[in-house]
Amino acid sequence: MVAGVTMAGALLAAPRLHAQAFEGSITMRMGSRGPQGAMSQVVEYLVRGGKMRVTMGGPMGGAAMIVSPTEKKLYMLLAAQNSYMEMSLPDSAADRARTAAAGADSVTVTRTGRREQVAGLTCEHVLVSSRGSATDLCLTPELGRFVNPMASLQGGALAPWQRQLGAEFPLKVTMADGSVPLEVTKVERKRLSNDLFAVPNSYTKVTMPPRRSPG
């Protein structure tokens, strides 16, 4: 039931100054393919003071994640159950080791210099090639580092392309077959309440399911 987020080490890395300055919401459309065919959902990011809240729609009220790099914690909020789960984020050194083991050197990153306007922001198309397949990421440095809420909660390593490029956020991702699994549709700079980045007092803590070992 838990929709996950990997790249935990990315959350602990020091963001760039201009990324820290962003406060507001980022709305995106994310898609995936499964046994039942293509699926799509709207995901909302809220960013304030280094903290992040990711909200995903779904039956029974969906779920939200709060990431607090200073606490090295991730909180999964389950609104329908008035409950939450807590996860400790790995340290950056351990994440770098996992990234290297995952084969970061096998990924080739090519900046094309081609730019596009997406959701009112300028991004540069970057080709990420691995094992004969290339993915086009249109990246901006204005929103900080990306966290993928659709990935599984396995204490995942930093994605190889992020290891090479640093704190950049994809506004649009295009696969080799032309499909677009991620596209930002709206970016709004605005003040956000601290309460959005805290677990509600009425929520009860429940146990996080054990992670499956990679592979």
Predicted regions and their residues:
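Extended soluble regions of mature proteins
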Residues: 18-215
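N-terminal export leaders
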Residues: 1-3
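Cleavable N-terminal signal peptides
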Residues: 6-7, 17
